[in-house]
């Protein structure tokens, strides 16, 4: 665990920072996704998400993060997968699908850091994310391939006899 000004960072036993994020969709058709401006690079777009707090479940963390970063409430859906980023720092992000039911006019990050949000067609979102945050583009690419909990990335190692 490490302390940051307004949060405590948590790590799993393998040293990965525990994160959670949501692909926030305008409707259950999942054809328009909400992206937020990056806090470091305000002219670039990212998927809302962040670090999990101690004792927090991934789904709860994902809902909290999109409320803080994107100012949305919604219906939490399926776990799309667990995505690993092995660069320093290492992250392991639980990515959920959320259908937006409420857009707040003002929200925490819009007031404190001027964060913006914008709806994108999925194909356009993939293009803008590939430049700045390729791992975020992977979330949407997986969704297009029919990602669901049964075929999501798994953190469990495969058994030796399952290799071809």
From Swiss-Prot:
Motif (Nudix box): 50-71
EC supergroup of this enzyme: hydrolase
Chief localization: cytoplasm
Signal peptide stretch: none
Domain Nudix hydrolase: 17-144
Region (Disordered): 144-164
Disulfide bonds: none
Name of the protein: Diphosphoinositol polyphosphate phosphohydrolase 3-alpha
Organism listed in the record: Homo sapiens
């Amino acid at each position: 665990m490490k302390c940051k000004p307004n949060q405590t960072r948590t790590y799993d036993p393998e040293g990965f920072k525990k994160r959670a994020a949501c692909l926030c969709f305008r409707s259950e058709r999942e054809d328009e996704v909400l992206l937020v401006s990056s806090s470091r690079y305000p002219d670039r777009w990212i998927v809302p998400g962040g670090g999990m707090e101690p004792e927090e479940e991934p789904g709860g963390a994902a809902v909290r993060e999109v409320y803080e970063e994107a100012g949305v409430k919604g219906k939490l859906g399926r776990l799309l997968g667990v995505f690993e980023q092995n660069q320093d720092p290492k992250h392991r992000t639980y990515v959920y699908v959320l259908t937006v039911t409420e857009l707040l006019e003002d929200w925490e990050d819009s007031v404190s850091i001027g964060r913006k949000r914008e709806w994108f067609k999925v194909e356009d979102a993939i293009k803008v994310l590939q430049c700045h945050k390729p791992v975020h583009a992977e979330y949407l690419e997986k969704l297009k391939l029919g990602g669901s909990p049964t075929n999501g990335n798994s953190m469990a190692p495969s058994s030796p006899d399952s290799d071809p």
